[in-house]
């Protein structure tokens, strides 16, 4: 991996300090070159050896011009933004060897077992937002009113081209010496290339290309009401969102058709805080939010994921998921920089979007996205931040965050699916860390530990036939628990120089995915 980053921030402040302008720019370039070799058994129970050579290039840029203005009773801020991102995979090469013809004999069988692919994704985002907070004064009572708006236009283009190696069209089957030969030597020898030997042809797949646009406009109003020991913040937000997907209906020619996904929604929110004293308080909050499908999730485009050994395809019938959140939290602040909080939470999901996989074309697996009917998550969360000065370590601190979650996806009566935990949701989460901060030496060190419980990463089919057909039963795929430890060190010299060192996943434990029949 190679990462290149650059940042430029400029600030202008008026003489009276009431007007502040900032220009923020951040640029990142990430390049990843990877070779992967895999041995195992495929979905058809054939022994398989396969390899992937890939180079991935990702570019991101984010620029924003902001302004903040303070008046007698108002605080106004605004922003204008532009963002760009691309992802290029030039010449991703894959080949496949298996024993489908002769059990126990690993070999190439057709030129289609060797492929080369070029993909390119480009995305542009333009945004505009403004907010105003007006403070009222009625004697000792000082409520405030906040209003604002936001607009965003996002556009994306995605194109891919796939090529395969074929043998002499009049014969088609590879000669035996090629079937058993080394693939890299086979392709690097120019004597093997020609119209009557190995040649490369393009498989037209126009349905895998798409263009997309998304226009979102929003406005909100909120009030802050101080009522003695009770503080209330309540508001409502309206959002209009129009996503357009333009894709091809045929593979061999440009045949674009457009589909819109429009939503108009109100999202209420309520946050209340009751302060018993300066060290103890209770919070209650409610909010409604939305999880809209991404472009790739509604696109009919098919992409082969080598890590999954399966195709990945979007779902054009995908719907937005609406989420209602309720949180009750008690907070205790023993001293400055220390806190203990205990929360009970509940989340209701209407039409949650889940990552699923199923059988296609007999025995091939394909991953996609699907709406479940509904889901409920509820649980407890404990958060602790503690300085270790009481044991003679004043520069050290400890943090802990843990949660227990009960998750349940509900299906309609008579459905062939069984109630289960929501895809991607772990029954428990543990995050803890030790921190060292020496202000005099300008040195910071952090050691972090993380563990998540067993969770479904691919939803299968609970009921179905035992045969190898499109109605076959497919067990859920689980990601098993895994421990990770990260280390980061930061050292500053004066006000302008800083060196950071980060090491991720020190334990490097294996990642296990399992199915339970």
Predicted segments with their positions:
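Transmembrane beta-barrel wall of Gram-negative outer-membrane proteins
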Residues: 1-35, 58-65, 72, 268-270
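Short loop/turn motifs that connect adjacent beta-strands in outer-membrane beta-barrel proteins
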Residues: 15-20, 72-75, 135-144, 160, ...
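Transmembrane beta-strands of outer-membrane beta-barrel proteins
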Residues: 19-23, 76-80, 143-149, 232-236, ...
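Transmembrane beta-strands of outer-membrane beta-barrel pores
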Residues: 27-31, 71, 82-88, 120, ...
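Signature of Gram-negative outer-membrane beta-barrel scaffolds
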Residues: 30-31, 115, 126, 131-279, ...
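Outer-membrane beta-barrel signature, preferentially recognizing the C-terminal barrel domain
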Residues: 48-66, 204-217, 290-349, 360-387, ...
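Gram-negative outer-membrane beta-barrel transporters
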Residues: 345-349, 366-459
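C-terminal beta-signal and adjacent terminal beta-strands/loops
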Residues: 350, 451-468, 490-517
